[in-house]
A protein has these predicted regions:
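C-terminal interaction module
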Residues: 108-242
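Surface-exposed beta-strand edges and flanking loops
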Residues: 19-21, 32-34, 41-43, 70-71, ...
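Acidic, low-complexity cytosolic segments
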Residues: 45, 49-74
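Short, intrinsically disordered low-complexity segments
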Residues: 3-48
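Generic surface-pattern signal
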Residues: 2, 62, 104-105, 140, ...
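Short, solvent-exposed loop/turn motifs
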Residues: 25-27, 75, 200
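Mixed-charge (acidic/basic) macromolecular-recognition segments
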Residues: 73-136
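Short amphipathic beta-strand/extended segments with alternating polar/hydrophobic composition
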Residues: 28-32, 78-83, 195
């Protein structure tokens, strides 16, 4: 994963994400710690991914020639797996219910998918509720779209910290309604910009200028600008210097 929590395909790092290409959902993290093979399953997730997780547990137990594994500091036996799948299913449904109960205090919640973060709000929770199959299908559909998920780069310019997105012509692009850095890893960003055709516009100005968006999630919209639309935007909004 990169600094924006996006998947870097076909690379193995200290922490690597495993997934079934049929299910673009949350993924299963694998890493080595003190000679132990460690797997991490983020909840809530779908039953497909819960089943895949425990399939991998069985595979690695067989590889290590053992019937035992540790989960949440408890020693488990492979015969406990069916019960653990029921537990994780219930925990996932409860987590979705908990998110819905807390929406009055938050605009949305951000969860981490395999390919990139997804913002879950009222619309999303109304669609899938606590149904894990619907939740899993939602995660897959969002990440299977043939679209560019824009992420920011942060720069220091004249003593100020600025954030910058890139937007190209005729590319379906997913942009945040409110620009941000995932997990607030970098704070104190004074201004946000979009880089187009070797020119800069202020982020908020471009978002006001664009006439048509398609909904993506609670904090993202999809846009596809033609060369002519980008030229029109730059003629009106381009700035000479930061």
């Amino acid at each position: 994963m990169d600094e924006n929590c996006q998947l870097i395909p076909n690379q193995i790092g200290d922490h690597t994400i495993l997934f079934d290409r049929k299910y673009l959902q949350r993924g299963i993290e694998i890493y080595i710690q003190n000679h132990d093979i460690c797997l991490n399953l983020s909840l809530p997730t779908s039953m497909d991914e819960i089943q895949l997780f425990y399939y991998l547990v069985k595979v690695y137990c067989e590889y290590m020639d053992t019937n035992e594994f540790v989960k949440d500091d408890w020693l488990m036996d492979l015969k406990d797996i069916d019960l653990q799948m029921v537990y994780d299913k219930r925990t996932s449904a409860d987590a979705l219910m908990d998110l819905k109960s807390k929406l009055s205090d938050h605009k949305y919640f951000e969860i981490f998918g395999i390919l990139h973060p997804i913002s879950i709000g009222e619309n999303e929770l109304n669609d899938f509720g606590t149904d894990l199959d619907l939740f899993g299908q939602y995660l897959h559909n969002q990440q299977a779209l043939d679209a560019y998920y824009a992420t920011p780069r942060i720069y220091n310019a004249h003593g100020r910290r600025i954030g910058m997105y890139a937007l190209g012509a005729n590319i379906l692009t997913i942009l945040p309604v409110e620009p941000y850095v995932v997990l607030n890893q970098i704070e104190g960003i004074e201004e946000w910009y979009v880089f187009m055709n070797d020119s800069l516009v202020k982020y908020r100005d471009l978002m006001s200028f664009i006439k048509k968006f398609d909904y993506y999630d609670a904090n993202h919209r999809m846009v596809c600008l033609s060369k002519e639309e980008i030229s029109e935007a730059l003629n009106t909004l381009a700035i000479q210097e930061i």
